[in-house]
């Protein structure tokens, strides 16, 4: 069955908490989109409220509290930030299940591969590492990294960091290419997902669908999830 993951873009901590609450007890994993206003134009928590100095962010880093509803939900951090590698240790303190790096933001790919393969074994066992790729980046660029990560996230929209964008059909060819070359690779698609697009993505072999507006603005989230999970 396809895995459905809600994507949360948050103006501030309370906004994030309220959006996560919508799927609490319904879905086990939520993707938190962290946007720094540098790698992408949009800015989300904690960068929109002071960055590392944000009081809630500080409380989590100091282990005074956890992420909202951390006892019920696992988190996938989508690092749409310029400092993903240099501040990796900080992001791990949010206790994510998965972390997604963006290939366009990590710099030299050989150095990044060395970084991934050099992550402490304890951390690597606890956190799945994914690499995201934009529709405008040649899919071949990701090939050298595939065997060093746990999954690939294909962005389904050209302007990342924003929700409600139109799906970019180029991602379908990227998925096809990846599945042909790496049949066992877990592929996630983030952005532009609606029911019609979801059907195409599942037929193309996608394992995970990451959706923001489709889920969080749905009149009935449970029904929306049920429809997506039963697409074949």
Regions found by a protein language model. Give the residues of each.
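Alpha-helix-loop-beta-strand connector modules within alpha/beta enzyme cores
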Residues: 46-77, 115-135, 170-193, 227-232
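Glycine/Thr-rich beta-alpha phosphate-binding loop at enzyme active sites
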Residues: 40-49, 135, 141-176, 180-182, ...
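Glycine-rich phosphate-binding active-site loops on the catalytic face of alpha/beta enzymes
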Residues: 99-108, 153-164, 204-225
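Hydrophobic faces of well-ordered beta-strands that scaffold small-molecule active sites
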Residues: 2-8, 30-32, 73-79, 99-101, ...
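Conserved, mostly hydrophobic/aromatic
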Residues: 23, 32-33, 91, 152, ...
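Hydrophobic, well-structured mid-protein blocks that either form specific transmembrane helices
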Residues: 86-140
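Catalytic cores of alpha/beta
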Residues: 16-23, 85-93, 136-148, 193-209
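Structural motif
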Residues: 25-27, 70, 94, 124, ...
């Amino acid at each position: 069955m396809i895995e459905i993951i809600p994507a949360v873009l948050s103006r501030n901590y309370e906004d994030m908490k309220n959006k996560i609450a919508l799927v609490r007890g319904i879905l086990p994993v939520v993707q938190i989109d962290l946007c720094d206003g540098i790698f992408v134009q949009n800015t989300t928590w904690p960068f929109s409220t002071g960055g590392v100095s944000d009081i809630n962010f500080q409380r989590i880093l100091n282990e005074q509290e956890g992420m909202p509803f951390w006892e019920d939900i696992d988190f996938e951090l989508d690092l749409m930030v310029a400092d993903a590698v240099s501040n990796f240790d900080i992001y791990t303190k949010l206790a994510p299940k998965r972390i997604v790096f963006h290939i366009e933001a990590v710099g030299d790919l050989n150095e990044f591969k060395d970084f991934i393969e050099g992550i402490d074994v304890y951390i690597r066992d606890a956190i799945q590492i994914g690499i995201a790729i934009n529709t405008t980046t040649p899919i071949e660029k990701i090939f050298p990294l595939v065997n060093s990560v746990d999954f690939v996230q294909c962005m389904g929209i050209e302007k990342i960091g924003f929700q409600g964008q139109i799906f970019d059909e180029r991602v379908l060819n990227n998925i096809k290419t990846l599945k042909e070359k790496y049949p066992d690779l877990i592929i996630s698609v983030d952005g532009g997902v609606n029911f019609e697009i979801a059907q195409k993505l599942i037929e193309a072999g996608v394992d995970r669908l990451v959706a923001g507006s489709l889920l969080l603005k749905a009149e009935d989230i449970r029904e929306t999830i049920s429809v997506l999970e039963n697409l074949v």
